[in-house]
Amino acid sequence: MSACVPTVSSPLPLQDPMSKLWRRGSTSGAMEAPEPGETLELSLAGAHGHGVHKKKHKKHKKKHKKKHHQEEEAGPTLQTPAKPQLKLKIKLGGQVLGTKSVPTFTVIPEGPRSPSPLMVVDNEEEPMEGVPLEQYRAWLDEDSNLSPSPLRDLPGDLEGQEEEEEQRWLDALEKGELDDNGDLKKEINERLLTARQRALLQKARSQPSPTLPLPVGGGCPAPALTEEMLLKREERARKRRLQAARRAEEHKNQTIERLTKTAAPSGRGGRGAARGERRGGRAAAPAPAPMVRYCSGAQGSTLSFPPGVPTPTAVAQRPAPSGPAPRCSVPGCPHPRRYACSRTGQALCSLQCYRINLQLRLGGPEGPGSPLLAT
C-alpha cells in the first residue's frame, strides 16, 4: 500500500545569482530550480514508512513557522508574477515514479464531483484543479513508455468473438458435429488424460466407424401385390378395427358398472337402504336339501329324518334289557362293569381288578401276598 507522504511547501525567494546556473542545467537533464512564486515540494517519507510520526510532529511545528514566515514575506512574493505551469508527481511508498511538467491544461467546468484516485492531491491548502482523465492517461503512457489503454477496444472485440463463435456453431450444425446437448464439441487436452484414457482415445480415433452404409439400388425387389392379396389385407384390417371397437365397448361397460356399484351406497337411503334394496332385488336363496341326522349316546342311538321324507325301511325296535346292570366279575367287587378284559373277556371296572383277574385266570406274577389282592 502506498503511504501518505506529507510534503512541506515553503515559498523561497530566489534572488541568488546561482539561480541562472540552475536554469542552464535544466536543459541538460539536471534539477530545475523553481521560479519565483512557485512552491518547492520536499518528500519526507522512507521506503518502508519509518519515521512517519516524527515527521508529522516536525510538520506541525514548521506549519506555525511557515505561517509566520508568510506573513513577514507576503509583500515580496506577490510582486513577482508566477507562470501558469502545473507539475504532476506520482509517488508510491515514498518513491517518485514519474514527473511531468505540463505548460497548458484544461479545467473541467463541471459540477462538484469526487476526485479521481489518479489525481495527486497535496495536503496543503492549495486550490484543487482537475485534469481530464484522457490527458492524464496520455501523460502516463509517455512517461512509462506503455501502449495506450486497451479498454476502449473491449466492446468491439467482444462483439467480434460472439460473431465468430456463432459462425462456428452454425458450421458445426451443418456438419452434424454438435454433441447431445447441442453445444460445440470441446477439444480434449491429452496432457490432462491418464495413460489409459490416452490409449483408449487413440484407439477410438484409429478404428473406423462401425456404421455401415445402407444399400441404395441393390437388394431383392418388392413382390407385386395381386387383387387377392389386397382383399386379404383389407379384411385383416377390418377385423382388427372391429376387435378394437369391441374391446373399447367392453371396457366402457365395465367402467360404468364399477362406477354404479361404488356410487350405490351413497344414495339417499344410506348404506342400509342400499343393502336392503340389493337383498330384495336378488333371487331368493334355494331351500336347503333334506338332511338325515344320526345321534349315538348313552341312552341309545337315534336316526332322524326330515318331515315328509319316508323312512327307507321299517326299523325293528329292540326290547329294553331287563334286570340289573352287569357288575365286575372279580369276586368281592361291587362296582358296575366298565370294560372287558382283552385276554379273558371278563367284565372289569378298574386296573386293579384287571390284575387280579389275570392272577386268578392265568396265574400271573402276583402271588397271594400281593398288595393288590390285599386291597
Swiss-Prot record:
Organism of origin: Mus musculus
The protein's role, per its UniProt record: Proposed core component of the chromatin remodeling INO80 complex which is involved in transcriptional regulation, DNA replication and probably DNA repair.
Region (Disordered): 1-84, 143-165, 201-220, 262-287, 312-331
Zn finger limits (HIT-type): 324-355
Sequence positions bearing Phosphoserine: 114, 116, 144, 147, 149
Any one GO biological process: regulation of chromosome organization
Subunit record text: Component of the chromatin remodeling INO80 complex; specifically part of a complex module associated with the helicase ATP-binding and the helicase C-terminal domain of INO80. Interacts with RP9.
Protein name: INO80 complex subunit B
Compartments, record wording: Nucleus; Nucleus, Nucleolus
Pfam families noted in UniProt: PAPA-1, zf-HIT
Superkingdom classification of source: Eukaryota
Coiled coil: 230-262
Segments of skewed composition (Basic residues): 50-68
Keywords recorded for this protein, A-Z: Coiled coil, DNA damage, DNA recombination, DNA repair, Metal-binding, Nucleus, Phosphoprotein, Transcription, Transcription regulation, Zinc, Zinc-finger
GO molecular function term, any single one: zinc ion binding
Tissue specificity comment: Expressed strongly in the testis and moderately in the kidney, skeletal muscle, liver and lung.
